Amino acid sequence: MDAPIEVDTQRARFQNSTGRNIQYVDDVSWIKSKHTLQFGGNFRHIPTIHIRNDKVVGSLASLEALSDADVSTFLSAIPSSERPPTCSVTLTTGCLQSGDAQRWDRLYASTLGLVDNIGILTTRDGSLKALPFGTPLANDTTLNAVEFYGQDVFRITPNLTLTYGLSYGWQTAPKERLNRQTLVVDTSNNNQSLTGPGYIAAKEAAALQGKMYNPTLGFDPVKSAGRNVFNIDWGDVAPRASVAWTPTFDSGFLHRMTGNRKTVIRGGFGLVYDRINTVQSVIIPMLGVGFAQTISVGAPLCNASGTPGAGCNAAAGTGSPGAASFRVGVDGSLPLPTVPAVSIPVVPSTPFGELFSFQDDPNTKVGRSRAGDLTIQREIPGNMIVEIGWTGRWSDRLPQGVNFNSAPYFFVDQASKQSFAQAYDAVATALAAGQTPAAQPFFENQLAGLIGSACAGSSTATTATQFLANAAASNFTGGLVSSLFSVMDGRRTCLGLPTFQNRQLFDLHMRTYIGKSNYNGLIATLRKRTSHGLTFDATYTFSKTLDQNISNQNQAGIYSNSYFPNVDYGPSLFDRTHIFNLSYVYDLPLGKGHRFGGGSWTSRLLGGWYTSGIFSAFSGLPLFVTESSQVWGGGSIFGFAVGMIPTVNPSSFGNSVHGGVTGSNGIGTTGNPANKGTGLNLFADPAAVFGDFRNVQISKDGRTGRANPIRGLPYWNLDSSLGKKTALTERVSFRITADFFNIFNHVNFVDPTLSLTQKASFGVISTQLVPTNRDNTLADGSRWIQLGLRFEF
């Protein structure tokens, strides 16, 4: 088991989208003196019907029973008494490495069939009446997109042209035929709509003062709220301007450099707006609470169905989940969830009346990019043109998700002034070293009264710190901050104390507009126009793109740190420093009219041959040694894995394939040739490299390891073609071709995984990179030859 909820719904689910695009476009051009004026408009009416039987993850419109441990929604953490001891300096056999405690707990829960929750997706009609189990979720929406533009190409002189213009547009929010959309609201504040930045800022401010911020959330149907799921962004004004200059110098150095009207200098700047795609405009608004709801039975006890199996001890509670929890196949029929009655606004019950909700920020903005470029183009002898230039993009307001239930890891205990982060790091450091952690004031004060109470179950711990270290050791050693907050909230609920997190939902994903990225690139291009049968185009790019580890609009990802997204600021996952591409076509100088000609039949035999090819070479993508996605409390499911901190310069590791690597100390060992491994590894000594990274310390570190990545394997490939065209008559000819994909049979490998939780496969290379045009069951990434014969008439 590797997740606390059913993530494989994305394999079992079905989705159907039926969309149309009714579009009207009108453009006008008017030439007046030195001006070429252009005006136009674009109107789109976009009706869309989307039907699905899932809510991304967590449930289907059919019953599911889920098993997990440690990052569970409901199931108690596996206590240390039910796992082998943690290895230390003095204990090296019959023990678990600190990073393997979570894997053991999950094996324990899945082997015994311990049920975390039993759930199903239930849907409601436009009046919130529950529909029969198995009814899929459906939305029938319409929206409009409008754009206008104006532009002037002003040829000031024969050598100088100025282009400037302005565009303006907007996109409406989707209108659902039965109003089956909701907004998340604060029920204690007159059902005020909540925004992503506003909620996160309020929660942060409260935590720094040692206070809880958990307003009771409601989900208000748009008809009741009297508004759309998000506001129209009316401010998308997009100016742009560019200039092109052909210098004319009659003599001297500048004349020799620029030639006689053979050089063009171009520069420009523009503001460009994104569009809101179907996921954000149609799908997310239908995944809120109310018209779609995951109902569940959380952590049922072994006697829940009245037919407990052997060994059932429901009274053991959290002290022994193996004895107290419902066991699939042992304790009878699964207990069924009950569909709750709802009112307006829909208020999920506690604990976890709903597992997940997806919402659009009602104040969402359209992403934008400030784009600039400056290039110099020069014609040179040989029918060639060389161009060198810079291009840049600075983007903001990009769509990205925040989690309302991001754990406030900076929460300050007002009595001791110790933060959760400080207490957490102290315990995590001690456990990693195999030591007993000292009592931490934060845990003792925030869980006051726990020791000696029924809320501690059968634990023999004498301090709250020891209780947490025993019950949730892997939460400390594995960076599972969100899960640890869930454990603490469970105990605080039992003690009658307010919780750190909202307990109505496990996670609330809100798509908001605070993402940032930038790109800068130096581009050099050499183009040859066709002469002597040869034409080619060669381009080299030296660039860097940086972002906050954000994802595309159609992704469900959230920031690993919703409070401070810039902790992940670093090279984008697709960043390549060096990129070179070359394409060419060459008509061989054979046959009539060429250097090597001949008679009629000789010319027909020798003539018409040509070759072409595409060569590509890239430097490696950024790679990160990762721990969990919960390091900053971002959430259990949708967050991105956090990069560990390198203690040496990652460039010292290199980025080439090493052969004959067996691995050691349980690190990189799946590649051992003696165990039928590949023997290939990104590192000559994976264990040594693994030791050069440390866990993020949330009380001290302001950035993650994404700021300083390892670079993955470089790539190069040549595809080439050889062909001949032969004329039979004036109107009939035939062509034979031989296309060679990866003509040199060069192996390109997929970058390996580098995860704290998968030590055995650390750095192990086991997969070839298969081009998208291959049938990987037949050719993999090896040389592929395609022969062709074509008649033309």
Give a label for each model feature.
Residues M1, G19, R44, D54-E64, ...:
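Flexible, surface-exposed loop regions and adjacent strand-edge segments
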Residues M1-Q23, W30, V115-F133, P300, ...:
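Acidic/polar loop-and-plug regions of large Gram-negative outer-membrane beta-barrel proteins
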Residues G19, L143-K175, N179-R180, N190-Q192, ...:
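Structural signature of Gram-negative outer-membrane beta-barrels, strongest in the C-terminal barrel
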Residues V25-D27, S33, G40, Q151-V153, ...:
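Alpha-helical hinge/cap motifs
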Residues S76-S110, L114, I120-R124, N190-F219, ...:
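Surface-exposed intrinsically disordered loops and tails
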Residues F133, D140-T142, N159, G169-A173, ...:
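Short, solvent-exposed micro-motifs at the edges of structured domains
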Residues N260-L301, D396-V402, S612-A617:
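Surface-exposed extracellular loop regions of Gram-negative outer-membrane beta-barrel proteins
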